[in-house]
Curated annotation (Swiss-Prot):
Upper taxonomic lineage: Viruses, Riboviria, Orthornavirae, Negarnaviricota, Polyploviricotina
GO biological process: clathrin-dependent endocytosis of virus by host cell; fusion of virus membrane with host endosome membrane; fusion of virus membrane with host plasma membrane; viral budding from plasma membrane; virion attachment to host cell
Pfam families reported in the protein's UniProt record: Hemagglutinin
Residues glycosylated per entry: 24-25, 39, 55, 80, 143, 182, 302, 500
Membrane topology note: Single-pass type I membrane protein
Record-given protein name: Hemagglutinin
Subunit structure as annotated in this protein's UniProt entry: Homotrimer of disulfide-linked HA1-HA2.
Site residues by UniProt (Cleavage): 346-347
Miscellaneous comment in the UniProt entry for this protein: Major glycoprotein, comprises over 80% of the envelope proteins present in virus particle.
Source organism (scientific name): Influenza A virus (strain A/Victoria/3/1975 H3N2)
Amino acid sequence: MKTIIALSYIFCLVFAQDLPGNDNNSTATLCLGHHAVPNGTLVKTITNDQIEVTNATELVQSSSTGKICNNPHRILDGINCTLIDALLGDPHCDGFQNEKWDLFVERSKAFSNCYPYDVPDYASLRSLVASSGTLEFINEGFNWTGVTQNGGSSACKRGPDSGFFSRLNWLYKSGSTYPVQNVTMPNNDNSDKLYIWGVHHPSTDKEQTNLYVQASGKVTVSTKRSQQTIIPNVGSRPWVRGLSSRISIYWTIVKPGDILVINSNGNLIAPRGYFKMRTGKSSIMRSDAPIGTCSSECITPNGSIPNDKPFQNVNKITYGACPKYVKQNTLKLATGMRNVPEKQTRGIFGAIAGFIENGWEGMIDGWYGFRHQNSEGTGQAADLKSTQAAIDQINGKLNRVIEKTNEKFHQIEKEFSEVEGRIQDLEKYVEDTKIDLWSYNAELLVALENQHTIDLTDSEMNKLFEKTRRQLRENAEDMGNGCFKIYHKCDNACIGSIRNGTYDHDVYRDEALNNRFQIKGVELKSGYKDWILWISFAISCFLLCVVLLGFIMWACQKGNIRCNICI
């Protein structure tokens, strides 16, 4: 009896060696996969607010260098002078005479140190001179007759002596007369001329007659295109530098071929010449950031910023080729594929699961690739062609976004007088609306680009899979998880031919068909076929043993077999 049971057990073991799936020498497994990282980056697409990708680039510049770079733009530091003070010739701003700039930087510590003045349209004059980019001044010989020139004031010291604005000529009575002044100055040049002039407003009637004789003066400045008539307003004003009188500053632009006419019977602050007007992209900015030796195309009041990103939220005010201002603190552009972190699976094929299962964190030499298992072991290799195809289409994406958004001009500060408050409110509303619109457009643009990138990288993966499937044809079976079961012996050279596209399926066709039919004849189409086969085998062995035991007991009862039990 022992002999029979032993023979039965040996028979079962021999049978077990012939179960399908135990001979891996005649088959191989090839899986396609893509790159993955342990911790990806979340980006936004049209269809998903948060989708993880292997790599992404930040598109919003959110910090400055903290200093204004002096290259490539020519920066003129106003230090203690405003641009208008430098224009008029305030004594402490004499160092700015005939200066040029791309960007004039006004400081919060700037102050006036001459006769108190106001400019009725200060912002327009400031912007006009700033955009010209120069304080180049040409003296002209105006013929003022019967009056005293070069008036000065103790409120405008030039050294120890009383002085005045260097670009203006204060005219007052000569003796006891102030004759009517009527002078002309033609523009025979080929460029516009900017004339700065003013009207003096005495604080009392006595001051008025002491300086100009007449109780009421009048100043008229005209060209062929315009005329301005100003009547002085005599009256006391708040005291500034020991004076309660004021000067109002005006300007006139004389075109080539036009003529300047000045008529006055008193209170005239006359021009000494003209400023050359130039056209360009010069500007002005209020900032307390220091000026440093560095290079940057984009300048904000906070300091220079790089312009290698399409958007910035450092400051609305900019100069140069700058990223577009948006409200968002961050906008990320996907520069990698959809990230599916690798799962630590177990099992015969768990270690080389395909792209449908999860990504491959170990693949660092490409975005797409192959893993295989054959009689020579396991291996992995990247597919450089599909990787390069995806990279080529993504590489130019950032530059294209920058080209669409970077401003090649500056966003200047806008100022309005108090009486223009409603205009200022409207301007602010328009600017805020523009920023809202650009912020929305930026988010939409990035979401569209991210959607395209993910669709593109998914498409390249599918192209590689289809290319492999067309090569293998009936020699392999698609296992449905990104892997192929190859029904012929496929060594490393064979695997390499599949990867590089030189695989000849006809060479292996007969072997593959033969192996497929042999395996399929006994293979169960279930996800648990191996378990079912082993359970069936165990039950069969158990039943065989029961039958043998029953036969032995029956034979013992009939006397054909004698069984002695010794204790």
